[in-house]
């Protein structure tokens, strides 16, 4: 099936035919290695989970990344 690509402000948009309409508010978009662009519905649970991370500022993210640089702790064998 073919559909139209058009401009919406500074973005490119695609008219999705009725047979392919989504029943969610959010979709994930990504490009596969072969160049295909894929739209995939995001479930409400996934959407809520991802929203948890929106409030983290740059300082918090840098602190998490710095933790990866810590050497492993040495502990007594059990």
Swiss-Prot record:
Family assignment from sequence similarity: Belongs to the VapB family.
Annotated ranges, domain SpoVT-AbrB: 3-44
Protein name: Antitoxin VapB1
UniProt keyword list: DNA-binding, Toxin-antitoxin system
InterPro entries named in the record: SpoVT-AbrB_dom, SpoVT-AbrB_sf, VapB_TA_antitoxins
TM annotation in the entry: none
Pfam families recorded: MazE_antitoxin
Native organism taxonomy: Bacteria, Pseudomonadati, Pseudomonadota, Gammaproteobacteria, Pasteurellales
Regulation: induction: More highly expressed in early growth phase, expression decreases as cell density decreases. Part of the vapB1-vapC1 operon.
GO molecular function: DNA binding
Subunit relationships: Forms a complex with VapC1, and a weak complex with VapC2.
Disulfide bonds: none
Main function: Antitoxin component of a type II toxin-antitoxin (TA) system. Neutralizes the effect of cognate toxin VapC1 but not non-cognate toxin VapC2.
């Amino acid at each position: 099936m073919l559909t139209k690509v058009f401009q919406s402000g500074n973005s490119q948009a695609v008219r999705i035919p009725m047979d392919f309409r989504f029943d969610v508010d959010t979709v994930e978009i990504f490009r596969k290695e072969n160049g295909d662009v894929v739209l995939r519905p995001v479930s409400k649970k996934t959407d809520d989970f991802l929203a948890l991370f929106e409030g983290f500022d740059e300082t918090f993210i840098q602190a998490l990344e710095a933790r990866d640089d810590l050497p492993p702790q040495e502990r007594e064998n059990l």
